[in-house]
């Protein structure tokens, strides 16, 4: 089981490398290795969400209740305080939702319409999920070191804003899990195939697992940002 999202990034990179090597030599053995690796990746994703990410989301809710009980929201601050910008957090979440929606649709299509997909359709699927992934990646790179702002007064309804963001994170974990299951279905659909488009399908599947990795990374970043900000308030 993964202990940090960095481990997701490492394994995702390993899968990408294996696929690149497999495409180069068209080795069935290599593709079998990739399929096994992605299946294990899916299992670890589901376990991480259940054992790590869900608990972090619960921790945010708990800390919001504690902060509200201390009634710090109406206090004048003696010193400036650094808090995560809730609008930036929500913008990141919107991008995560978009890329996961695309990933689920693509995985479902690969799994259910295996014999019907043309080369052009596969190319379109790959381009769409790649574009959405790159948009999320760009936004995350933009905000990950610039998510905080300094406040001299506690913003009105800040706890409600973080609570809303945290609930969206909770919904995101469900979307990630669903995406992982659909990816598993797509893997099963190509496992025993000899179709000559398997290389393109494998590229789509690989980009989908990379999307899941990025979604978890961003969701955890948002949850951690909420938690850190709330604990700064009491």
Language model features: what each stretch is:
Residues 62-234:
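Long, low-complexity or tandemly repetitive, helically biased scaffold regions used
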């Amino acid at each position: 089981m993964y202990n940090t999202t960095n481990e997701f990034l490492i394994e995702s990179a390993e899968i990408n490398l294996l696929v690149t090597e497999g495409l180069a030599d068209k080795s069935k053995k290599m593709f079998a290795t990739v399929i096994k690796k992605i299946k294990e990746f899916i299992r670890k994703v589901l376990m991480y969400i259940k054992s790590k990410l869900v608990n972090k989301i619960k921790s945010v809710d708990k800390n919001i209740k504690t902060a509200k009980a201390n009634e710090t929201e109406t206090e004048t601050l003696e010193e400036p305080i650094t808090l995560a910008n809730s609008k930036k957090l929500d913008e990141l979440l919107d991008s995560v939702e978009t890329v996961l929606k695309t990933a689920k649709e693509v995985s479902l299509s690969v799994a259910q319409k295996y014999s019907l997909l043309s080369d052009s359709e596969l190319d379109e699927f790959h381009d769409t999920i790649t574009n959405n992934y790159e948009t999320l990646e760009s936004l995350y790179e933009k905000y990950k070191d610039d998510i905080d702002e300094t406040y001299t007064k506690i913003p009105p309804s800040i706890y409600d804003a973080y609570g809303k963001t945290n609930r969206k994170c909770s919904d995101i974990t469900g979307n990630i899990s669903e995406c992982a299951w659909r990816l598993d279905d797509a893997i099963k659909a190509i496992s025993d195939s000899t179709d000559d488009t398997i290389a393109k399908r494998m590229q789509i599947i690989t980009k989908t697992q990379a999307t899941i990795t990025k979604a978890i990374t961003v969701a955890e970043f948002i949850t951690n940002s909420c938690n850190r900000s709330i604990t700064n308030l009491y």
